Amino acid sequence: MEVDHADRDGARRRCREYLLALEEERRKIQVFQRELPLCFDLVTQTIEGMRSQMDAAGSEETVSDQGPPPVLEEFIPLKPSLSLSSSEEESTHADAAKSGKKEEAETSERHSSPPPPPPEAKKVTPDWLQSVQLWSQEEPQQPSSPSPTPTKDLPCKPVALNARKAGGAFQPFEKEKRAELPASSTTAAASSTVVGDSGDKPTDDDTEKHMETDKDNDKDAKDKDKEGQSQPHRKPRRCWAPELHRRFLQALQQLGGSHVATPKQIRELMKVDGLTNDEVKSHLQKYRLHTRRPSSTGQSSAAAGVPAPPAPQFVVVGSIWVPPPEYAAAAAAQQHVQLAAAGNNASGSANPVYAPVAMLPAGLQPHSHRKQHQQQQQGQRHSGSEGRRSGDAGDGSSSSPAVSSSSQTTSA
């Protein structure tokens, strides 16, 4: 008995150490519970099984310490009664033997087989395992006998997998493009993607070509639709007629010139239906570029009533800075002549442009005129010298008769 108790104590101590080691491992795995869910469940089930075995062993020890269970004695009559026959006695003895054998078998199975795990050992699978089903819960049942009614196969859409594209069991979602294709193309695509046992397998290049052609057709159709929608919204370009330009000039004159007026003010004064600020702005910019020349500035200032700018203080003549009091007067006279001519020709042209004519002062002459003047002076000098010579000769001839006459008078 002492040896049995020592063995039991040693086995209990080893089981307790093993249980402590398992709990330590479970604490280590609990840190990585999301990465190792199956390991955590296995260790937990093992710990629960060891605890149940230890509890069962402790209950058996307490029963063995108390002593053997009481045996219920069967009271068998020593003398058979007269009412029981020999066959009934044999059947009762056989039943008693069978019941005894059943009890012995149950006790042997109880000691040999481990106790069933408690209901706490059954853990619920985690949420992330429930969301993605990695196993099949129902085993496929093979029909023992063929069913008399044939099952109707559901229409399945053929799927063509591309081996070049990355990705395993999870394929990216793509919209179906079969609805946009005509009937002939859908049938051709279906026949190329469906793979039979005896037919050839379609290549990935064919499927890619089909998809590229479909995309090109879709893009062309979308571009045509956009062009058809954008064309009716285009506004025709504004054509500035002479009457419209005349109103534009009148508005500028009322507002004080092109550099003061704004497109909004011009449009309000013109009072033309359909005329926008952008159109007036573009026309005003063109008008400013057109009238940026020196003569045009003088004309616009005179038309708007603004005094003309003062005359320049120096004028370059032959690479020499000369103060031009006479040039300023000549330029002002020429400008007045041009303005008068512009007023006379206003009815003929809407916006005439005149270029100023440079005039030299009275005392200054160009180089060619200087040469001509010098030549004329030389010619005059030459003619003057010849006249003097002829005059001297005439004086000599006239003096000689006088001398002769005087000599004649003296001689007489």
UniProtKB/Swiss-Prot annotation:
Location of the HTH myb-type domain: 232-292
InterPro entries the UniProt entry points to: Homeodomain-like_sf (IPR009057), HRS1-like (IPR044787), Myb_dom (IPR017930), Myb_dom_plants (IPR006447), SANT/Myb (IPR001005)
Region annotated Disordered, chain positions: 54-241, 286-310, 358-412
DNA-binding as UniProt keyword: yes
Residue ranges of DNA binding: 263-288
Pfam families: Myb_DNA-binding (PF00249)
Keywords: DNA-binding, Nucleus, Transcription, Transcription regulation
Family matches, as PANTHER family: MYB FAMILY TRANSCRIPTION FACTOR, TRANSCRIPTION FACTOR HHO2
Protein name (record): Transcription factor NIGT1
